[in-house]
Regions:
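Conserved active-site segments centered on acidic
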Residues: 1-88, 157-168
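Helix N-cap/beta->alpha junction signal
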Residues: 22, 96-97
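Phosphate-binding/catalytic loops
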Residues: 3, 91, 97-168
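Hydrophobic beta-strand core positions in alpha/beta domains
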Residues: 13, 93-94
Length: 168
């Protein structure tokens, strides 16, 4: 997805396959952005560092855990990050250190995107990774939601400081 011309800020979440963590982050953060009334200013998307699940919907367990908490992941389709994403997204946020390393190697030298760990925006979780729930149980998916809710609040606060004020 390419950011809309009207969006001031683009945020891209990245995990390994784009079926568990990053689509959950996309869905949760999109809901937070909507609740803040900033949907026309912040574009939210997700991708995988690898194309293992390109074209697939998010993991059914991720969808179920999200829906249980009031977040909708339907309509999302897995895709692999491309170099051009660094031109379109201001924040390219990794779910773990391995993906962060991959993104930093991939990032074009002239890119202005902020590449960081998503949990750097969660108070008390700086430098930590969102654990991959893929091979685990349902509680792992619930933990992912807890973590991305917290980081999303911090990220939204950070972005809000830099958004142009809307005149009403």
């Amino acid at each position: 997805m390419v950011p809309q011309a009207s969006a001031s800020v683009g945020v891209l979440f990245v995990c390994l396959g784009n079926i568990c963590r990053s689509p959950t982050a996309e869905g949760v953060f999109r809901a937070q952005v909507q609740a803040a009334g900033l949907s026309n200013q912040i574009l939210v998307d997700s991708a995988g560092s690898h194309a293992y699940h390109e074209g697939e919907s998010p993991d059914v367990r991720a969808c179920a855990a999200a829906l249980e908490r009031g977040f909708d992941l339907s309509g999302q389709v897995g895709r692999q990050i491309k170099a051009i994403d660094f031109e379109h997204f201001d924040y390219v946020l990794a779910m773990d250190r391995e993906n962060l390393h991959y993104l930093r190697k991939m990032q074009p030298s002239d890119s202005q995107s902020r590449v960081a760990l998503f949990l750097d925006y969660a108070e008390g979780r700086e430098g930590q990774s969102v654990p991959d729930p893929y091979f685990g149980q349902a509680d792992g998916f619930a933990l992912v939601i807890d973590l991305v809710e917290s980081a999303g609040k911090g990220l939204l606060k950070q972005i809000g400081r830099n958004l142009p004020k809307i005149k009403t």
